[in-house]
Amino acid sequence: RCILRAADPNRMVYWSRGAVQDIYAYSPYSPSIAKEADMTCIPVSLPAEQVQSGADSPAHIGKYGFMYAQPCHITPETDMSEGVSLVFKQLFAIMNIRLKLTPDCALNEIPVIRMKLESAASALAYDKATVNMTTEDGIPVVTPGSSSNNIVLKFAENIILNKENYVSFYMMVAPGIHSAGDLNLEVIARDNSVYSVDIAAGVNIEPNMVYVRDFDLSLDSFVPADPYQIE
């Protein structure tokens, strides 16, 4: 359901006869921002630190996203009888990292406490940015303010890797072009040992897409931390 209200409660929303009305929609909505709304520079952010609640759970992804609809330009007396259709898309993309232990791994289970995705090419997260919703093709343009080339995914509880099934980890990432080897993935185990791999294939991360990468890890793949410390 979409409800139209005036940004100022003391004002009314009305249609100007014969005038084209421009309708923009996005989420999350901030009343404090909407009062001074400028569709050419809507504030947006994508945290460089994200928290997943548990194994295979994408429940956290929604709070990091920014949804937008293709703008509608209508003339009330001729177009309103057909209503206004708003189709929402995601401004960012989802990276689904799937991990499993190799059959010959010396351990049947390895608990992991966090992971990091880093790019040598472009930003993966925005501390501050703005979005222009008024582009001719209706595809928003992001102007970064301050950005980060890495995303750290933490877990509400330790997640256990096993030999039987892939375990899914989800990150919300910013669009960008990454050539072969630009992206590096680190997986940190409970003993602080680190599995690190450069993602061989290049990827052009586009909005509203899901990217899946599978990795099989052996015990020897983890480099011990110095000094050894259990978290």
Question: Which residues make up each language-model segment?
Answer:
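Short, low-hydrophobicity acidic/polar segments
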Residues: 1-109, 162-166, 191-193, 198-199, ...
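Contiguous beta-strand segments of beta-sheet-rich domains
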Residues: 22-25, 115, 182-183
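Compositionally biased regions
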Residues: 46, 54, 120, 147-149, ...
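Short helix-loop boundary/capping segments
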Residues: 81, 95-165
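Extended serine/threonine-enriched, polar tracts that run as long, contiguous segments within proteins
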Residues: 96, 117, 154-196, 200
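Extracellular/surface-associated beta-sandwich interaction domains
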Residues: 114-138, 199, 203-210, 215-231
